[in-house]
Amino acid sequence: MPVRQLPETVVNRIAAGEVVERPASVVKELVENAIDAGAGRIDIFTDGGGRRRIGITDDGGGMTKADLALAVDRHATSKLDDEDLLRIRTLGFRGEALPSIGAVAKLGITTRHGSEPHAWSLTVEGGRKSAIVPAALTQGTRVEVSDLFYATPARLKFLKTDRTEAEAIREVVRRLAMARPDIAFTLAGEERAPVTWTAALPGAAGQLTRLGDILGADFRCSAIAVRAERDGVTVEGFAAAPSLTRANALGQYLFVNGRPVRDKLIIGAVRAAYSDYLPRDRHPVVALFVTTAPQEVDANVHPAKTEVRFRNAGLVRALIVHALKEGLAREGRRTAANSDGAVLTAFRPAAVPRPANWDWRQSPASPVGAGPWSGGATAAAFAAPGQTAFDVGAPSADVRSDPNPVADLIDRPLGAARTQIHETYIVTQTRDGLIVVDQHAAHERIVYEKLKAALERDGVQRQILLIPDIVELDEATVEKLIDRAPELEKFGLAIESFGPGAVAVRETPSLLGKTNAAALLRDLAEHMAEWDEALPLERRLMHVAATMACHGSVRAGRILKPEEMNALLREMEDTPNSGQCNHGRPTYVELKLADIEKLFGRR
C-alpha cells in the first residue's frame, strides 16, 4: 500500500485519542480553559455520565469572533508565545483541547468578549466547522459537548457505566476546585444531586475552608498547616492528624503551580514523613501545593498534563518530608477525635422505649466497686507481677500530698485525673471540659519516644537477666533474628543462638521493665519477615522500637492509682507526638463543656 497523507479529520481523531480518553477528560480540558480565561464562577452539567451531554459555562474573558474561529483549529492558541514551552503558566491550550473534542463529538461554543457588541456561536461536528453566527450571552463562554465518541464508535465500548463515569467527572472537578478556592464551582447532573462550592476568601483560611468542603469536616477539624521553602521552591498546604487515615493513598493531593497532578513522588514522601505515626497499611490525607518557577517543572510529560517532571525532584521530596514532619511535631498532641460529630453522636442517649410509669429508683442497681481514689485493691493490682511501671514524676508527688489535686492540675493541658473506667480509660477534668485517655495507647507513645531518644543519645540502657530466657522458635525464624542481632542490641536486647530451634535472651531494655521475652521476640520476627531488604537501617530500627514500645507499655485492664494516672498525663504533656500512638490511633478524645451542655439541652 502506498504512503499517503491522512485527511485532517482522521488526524484530529488520532490526536483526540491522547487528550480525550473519557468524559472526565473533556470536563478537565474545558474547566481548565475556563480557569485560564479568568472565570470567577464555573457551572458544569453532565448527562449520561457525560456520554450524552456535557455543558460548561463560565464568566471569564470570553473570545472575540476572530479568536473563536481559530480556537477550534489545531495548534492555534492564545496561551503560548513562540518559545514558551518550557515556561508554561496556564493549565491548557484552547487550540489543543477544542479541536480534539470536536473531532470525536458534537461541539458547540457560544462566547462573548467585552469588546464585542454581542456573543458569537460556532458548532463543530466530527471535525467540520460551521459558520460563526450571532448569539445571546452576557459575558464569558458556554461550551456544550454532546454524543461523545459518536465519530469513533469503538471508543464507546471502553467507557464504564454512567455512574462510574459521573464519579470520574466529580473527582476531576473536586481536584480543580481544591486548586482554585477563589473560584465558585457548581456540578450538576442526573446521576446525583447538584453540589456547589462557593468562592472562598484569599489566604490559608479560605484554602482550608474549600478543602474542608470537599474532603469533609473531619479533615478540616484535624488539619495541620505545613510549609517549607528553599531555593525558589515552596511547599505548603494542610495535612490531617495521624488519627485520620484511609486504606489507600487516594486521599493525597498534589498541586504544582496550581495544576492538579498525580505523582508517585508525593506517596513516598508522605509515607516517609508519617512513618513514626502510622502502620504500613494506613495512609494519611494531605493536600500539598508546590510553587516553583515554570522552567523548573515540565508540564508536557503527558498530553493530558496529569503528570509533571521536576528538574530537581530530590529537593521537592525533601521539602515535602520536612514540611510534614515539622507540622506533625508542632501539633504532636493534637488528635482528630476531639469534639467532632462522631464523639458527640456517641454521647447522645439512644431512644430506648420505656413504660410511661418507669421510675429509675425502682430499677435494679449495678454493684459499685471501689474507685481508684480509694486505694486498697488498686495498689495491690498495680503491683501485680509481670506489669511494667512507668516513671512517676514530681507532679504525682504533689498529688499524693494534696487532698484536692484537681484544683492544682485542672489548668494543665490534659487536666486532672478523676477516675479510671473499665481498667483501660482514664477520665480527666479540664477547665473547659473532660478528656478520656487510652492508657495503653498513651504509654506506648511515651515508651517509643524514650527509646528513640535513648538510641540517639548514648544507647538504650540494659538489664542483665540472672537466668537467660530461652525462647523456642522455628529454625528459619531463629536465623532471621540472629542475623538482625546487632540491630536489636542497639535497643538493649541481647540475644544469641541456643541450638537449632531456640534463642537465648541475655539482656533486655531497662525501659521495658519485666517483659515477656518470648512474645516480644515472636512479634519482632513477624515484623522482620515483612521488611523489604531495601528498607533503610533507620526505618528498621524504628520498627523495632515500635514493637518494643507496644510490649513495654501499661496494658489495658490494669488498675492505676490516682498518682499513676496523673503521672501518665504529665508525661504525655512532655512527650512529642503524644496525640497518637505508634499505630496512628488517638491516645485521647476531648469533649468541651459547651458540647456537654448541648447534649443536655442547656445550650
UniProtKB/Swiss-Prot annotation:
One of its GO terms (molecular function) is ATP hydrolysis activity. It comes from the Bacteria. One of its GO terms (biological process) is mismatch repair. GO terms for cellular component: mismatch repair complex. Pfam families: DNA_mis_repair, HATPase_c_3, MutL_C. Keywords: DNA damage, DNA repair. PROSITE patterns: DNA_MISMATCH_REPAIR_1. SUPFAM superfamilies: ATPase domain of HSP90 chaperone/DNA topoisomerase II/histidine kinase, DNA mismatch repair protein MutL, Ribosomal protein S5 domain 2-like. This protein is involved in the repair of mismatches in DNA. It is required for dam-dependent methyl-directed DNA mismatch repair. May act as a 'molecular matchmaker', a protein that promotes the formation of a stable complex between two or more DNA-binding proteins in an ATP-dependent manner without itself being part of a final effector complex. Belongs to the DNA mismatch repair MutL/HexB family. HAMAP family: DNA_mis_repair. This is DNA mismatch repair protein MutL. The lineage of its organism: Bacteria, Pseudomonadati, Pseudomonadota, Alphaproteobacteria, Hyphomicrobiales. The gene is mutL.
